[in-house]
Amino acid sequence: MAGAGLIIIKRRIKSITNTKKITNAMGLIATSNLRKSRQNLEANKAYYEAFNDVINKIVSSSSKSNLYVAGNKSDKKLYIALTSDSGLCGGFNGAVVTAADNVMRGDKDKSLLITVGQKGISYFKRLKYETLSEYVDIPNEPGLKEAKEIADRALSLYEKGEIGEVHVIYTQFLSTVNQKVEVKKVLPIEPKKMEKVSVAEFEPDAEIILEKAIRLHIEQQLFNLLLNSKASEQASRMSSMDSATKNANDLLDALNIKYNRIRQSAITQEITEIVGGAEALK
């Protein structure tokens, strides 16, 4: 009996050891990807903030009836949910889908959905949501190409009057251990209040500039949100893999103790039987 028990435990130890190697390797990869994602996000920050400031000044100088500021007559809202293509990243995808479901559930007839990431597609199908467009295979280091493709689709729907608002549901990267799901409205543009600042003058007219700048602005918005999402995904995956590796170590410690106890008990019993047999021969 002891021998059979030892064999089973040895198999479990081997299986968990192999799993630990995988989770440890994935954790190291996630750490490397997170470092790159943070660098990309930081590099984009200054340009993103400066561009937003310029757009805000242009919007403040433009006509309040401008399509991109005043909106259109549609009462439908488009939600773009940013999820991951691969799993093993803790509650990252679940949190985004839950946030999306919370804002759309009560008004499904007027809510349209675009999903980014394979996991989002799977989640929303289970919740019986239909999608207008699906974007997958987003690289770990997304570029303007991916942002432009999504922005073009959203702008096309907005300019045709098929939707009246565009919101992006994404995970904001705050730190390695802190990420927060946000719902960000990107259209129509809502200019920030500019207190005690003179309205800038533009040449050519602000309306013409706005028409040309709006597409780039939406692309930059989506690009920044994709960078936030990717950094958050990698941070969540790194944390999940670290936890999995720690759990594997705890299991291995417990199994090794159990293995040694059974082995010690078997040896003790064997010695007892030998001694008992020797005594019987006297």
Curated annotation (Swiss-Prot):
An annotated GO cellular component: proton-transporting ATP synthase complex
GO biological process: proton motive force-driven plasma membrane ATP synthesis
Pfam families noted in UniProt: ATP-synt (PF00231)
Subcellular location: Cell membrane
CDD domains linked: F1-ATPase_gamma
Superkingdom, taxonomy of origin: Bacteria
Membrane topology: Peripheral membrane protein
Entry keyword set: ATP synthesis, Cell membrane, CF(1), Hydrogen ion transport, Ion transport, Membrane, Transport
GO molecular function, one term: proton-transporting ATP synthase activity, rotational mechanism
Signal peptide: none
Database matches in SUPFAM superfamilies: ATP synthase (F1-ATPase), gamma subunit (SSF52943)
Gene3D superfamilies (UniProt xref): 3.40.1380.10, ATP synthase, gamma subunit, helix hairpin domain
Keyword tRNA-binding (UniProt): no
Subunit structure: F-type ATPases have 2 components, CF(1) - the catalytic core - and CF(0) - the membrane proton channel. CF(1) has five subunits: alpha(3), beta(3), gamma(1), delta(1), epsilon(1). CF(0) has three main subunits: a, b and c.
Family, as annotated: Belongs to the ATPase gamma chain family.
Main function: Produces ATP from ADP in the presence of a proton gradient across the membrane. The gamma chain is believed to be important in regulating ATPase activity and the flow of protons through the CF(0) complex.
Protein name according to UniProt: ATP synthase gamma chain
Organism: Clostridium acetobutylicum (strain ATCC 824 / DSM 792 / JCM 1419 / IAM 19013 / LMG 5710 / NBRC 13948 / NRRL B-527 / VKM B-1787 / 2291 / W)
